[in-house]
């Protein structure tokens, strides 16, 4: 099964954070993992703003973790961007809205602890 990881789900997985739910851990261990380029961008933005602490500069650290954990990077397509316009404004975070649109367009569940995702027609794993 292909799954799309929210920003925090990927960060918590690679740092073995206890906040990652047992169900999410099981799914991550048995699925084809994808992380959106949008989430990569969000993580870099958070690291630059001092809201995310990483052991190395964000770009090389995250690139290395993607590779060593066999996580594929999902680019943003035109269909993803166009789908955002169709989404109700339950959630106003632009990173999350695009991630939700990607999950819908690809037909993949999203691994996230964010309760707002459940308001959209996308399967949520947590």
Identify the function of each model-found stretch.
Residues 1-36, 49-64, 106, 115, ...:
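Short, well-structured N-terminal submotif of metal-dependent ribonuclease cores
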Residues 22, 125-126:
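Short glycine/proline- and charge-enriched loop/turn segments
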Residues 41-42, 80:
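Short, basic/glycine-rich phosphate-binding loops at helix/coil junctions
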Residues 55-63, 67-116, 125:
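Active-site neighborhoods of divalent-metal-dependent phosphate/nucleic-acid chemistry enzymes
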